[in-house]
């Protein structure tokens, strides 16, 4: 997945991980050495840690009991409007 594809398909908003916890996608960024698209996101639980994950991995599916499921499913629009910050 290239950067433009990642920006157009992984939109800011609230997502649910296949294991049930929720996260907010903040941005799609570029890796400083490889330019690989990376998803910058934060946990919506606990200390609300901020994480990065390769965009290709974000969009992967996982198999559960023989059925393919998205690793992350978008469940709501962006929580914050970072342009107003």
Question: Residues of each region from the PLM?
Answer:
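Mixed-charge, low-complexity intrinsically disordered regions
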Residues: 1-85
């Amino acid at each position: 997945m290239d950067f433009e594809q990642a920006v157009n398909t992984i939109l800011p908003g609230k997502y649910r991980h296949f294991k049930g916890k929720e996260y907010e996608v903040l941005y799609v960024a570029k890796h400083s050495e490889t330019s690989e698209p990376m998803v910058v996101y934060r946990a919506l639980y606990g200390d609300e840690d901020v994480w990065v994950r390769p965009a290709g991995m974000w969009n992967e599916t996982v198999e559960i009991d023989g059925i393919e499921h998205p690793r992350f499913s978008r469940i709501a629009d962006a929580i914050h409007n970072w342009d107003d910050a």
